[in-house]
Amino acid sequence: MGTRLEATEQSNHRTQRNDIQLENAKAAGKMGISVDLEAKYAKLGLNLGAITFGEKDRKKMKNSHLRKQENANISLAVCALLNSGGGAIKVKIENENYSLTRDGLGLDLEASLCKCLPFVQWHLDFTESEGYIYIYVKSWSQEIFGLPIGTLRTNLYVRSMSSSVQVSAAAALEFLQDLEETGGRPCVRPELPASIAFPEVEGEWHLEDLAAALFNRTEFQYEETFPFTRSRYVEVTLLSAKRLRKRIKELLPQTVSAFANTDGGFLFIGLDGKTQQIIGFEAEKSDLVLLESEIEKHIRQLPVTHFCEEKEKIKYTCKFIEVHKSGAVCAYVCALRVERFCCAVFAAEPESWHVEGGCVKRFTTEEWVKLQMNAPSG
């Protein structure tokens, strides 16, 4: 019934690394960020295009996507300068009759900057001149922050309780250091000693056993109940056929990263977590082939970092289980079993930027890990 697939780790060939770097540089360009080669206001300057400033005018913005993009652009530019010795960002003021002193930046922009820097006032200064806002950025300080570079998002996930949680840069560094010290970890987790009883742990493992039994089924009945809930080892979601491919693209990287970096687990698509009923999603056989291909592609593209000699691939099993109603197939459940990984799996390249060769570039996972691991301690 099901088809077993194994995703391969991201290629380390130089050509692919160059492609990633080029793609990341293009991404910065699409966001309207460019290096100001004629900047007189700073040794290194970035142009950020036009942005609406001030709490009152930002609240009036009807385009929520644009508002989010402006937040992302400022955060990205600040991160790039922090990691490049400092500099300044030049931003054209989009709205008329604006005053930095009177109107401020806007609370959402301030919140975004606070996520970049816990001590904004130590590293950023703001001035207004002739229709522009200038954001002066000091260089990143490992002495202050305890980390070698600034990072907006690590994109490294673990499973915590019943959620996939992105770890902080500090936690990611600790996780990577532990892996380096031990040379990776066994792909099979150690068994719980029989002489030690931890009811809460045994309870979670029991949920995993129930999920494994469901995974091994060959068919379900429509609205049949299942006897477990979300846990460290299990994630369930109910998606319509229309939203399936889009949500798979969003859900899969984080979930696979979290399960792989913890102790493995199961993802069931087509189970209603609220009613604990098996519903499934409608699909043709051709749709399942396409979906399986999409899942394989997304997992194959996940960045990985190895500290072991074996350099295992991400291992998983994907299968589609029929859901029957009145004796006929009415839907399918997508069941994905992800194995515990030997080292680190990222949901995407870490969101950490720098300026190099006249371009704003995103560090590749390989570059980011090396910078984190090779930084002097203390």
Curated annotation (Swiss-Prot):
Official protein name in the record: Schlafen family member 2
Disruption phenotype: Conditional deletion in T-cells leads to impaired T cell-mediated immunity. T-cell show an accumulation of tRNA fragments, which inhibit translation and promote stress-granule formation.
Localization terms from the record: Cytoplasm
Tissue-level expression: Mainly expressed in the thymus, lymph node and spleen.
UniProt KW keywords: Adaptive immunity, Cytoplasm, Immunity, RNA-binding, tRNA-binding
Entry's Gene Ontology cellular component terms: cytoplasm
Disulphide connectivity of cysteines: none
Predominant localisation class: cytoplasm
Family: Belongs to the Schlafen family.
PANTHER family assigned to the protein according to its UniProt record, in alphabetical order: RIBONUCLEASE SLFN12, SCHLAFEN
GO biological process: negative regulation of cell population proliferation; response to bacterium; T cell mediated immunity; T cell proliferation; T cell proliferation involved in immune response; tRNA stabilization
Keyword Cell division on entry: no
Purpose: tRNA-binding protein involved in T-cell mediated immunity. Plays a key role during the metabolic reprograming phase of activated T-cell, when T-cells produce reactive oxygen species (ROS): acts by binding tRNAs and protecting them from cleavage by the oxidative stress-activated ribonuclease angiogenin (ANG). Also required for T-cell quiescence maintenance.
Lineage: Eukaryota, Metazoa, Chordata, Craniata, Vertebrata
A GO molecular-function annotation: tRNA binding
Induction: Upon interferon-alpha (IFN-alpha) treatment.
Gene3D superfamilies named in the record: Schlafen, AAA domain
